[in-house]
Amino acid sequence: MASKSSITPLLLAAVLASVFAAATATGQYCYAGMGLPSNPLEGCREYVAQQTCGVTIAGSPVSSEPGDTPKDRCCQELDEAPQHCRCEAVRYFIGRRSHPDWSVLKDLPGCPKEPQRDFAKVLVTPGQCNVLTVHNAPYCLGLDI
């Protein structure tokens, strides 16, 4: 049987390990409303529709001023998301294959959702917003889940 003096350090080590694990997990959430806005990348809808189908969304702000174009607004919103949550923000934006109705994207006249999804997958890349992600590179892996 183990003595009291050997159990105490083991118990202390276990408690410290669980406290450390909980502390490192704090702030790592990437859910809509927790770590991300409730509608992640809502500001990217206009840019994605323009790029994929050449259409504008009724009611969207129209500007060609430097820093206030649809691409600028989209990239700013993506840049404001925590780096470790950017791919998850794109995932929410395009919707999961298992729940396509949960997408921020909408079928528009002359602009189906699928081409918009395909374009939105590259929003983080160097040719678009060029932001670092959880992979510490401007790419998101596994967005077709």
Swiss-Prot record:
UniProt KW keywords: Alpha-amylase inhibitor, Disulfide bond, Protease inhibitor, Secreted, Serine protease inhibitor, Signal
Signal peptide start and end residues: 1-25
SUPFAM superfamilies registered for this protein in UniProt: Bifunctional inhibitor/lipid-transfer protein/seed storage 2S albumin (SSF47699)
Gene3D superfamilies tied to this protein: Plant lipid-transfer and hydrophobic proteins
The record's account of how the chain is modified after translation: Five disulfide bonds, which are essential for the inhibitor activity, are probably present.
GO molecular function: alpha-amylase inhibitor activity; serine-type endopeptidase inhibitor activity
Protein name, per record: Alpha-amylase/trypsin inhibitor CMa
Organism field: Hordeum vulgare (Barley)
Gene transcribed to yield this protein: IAT1
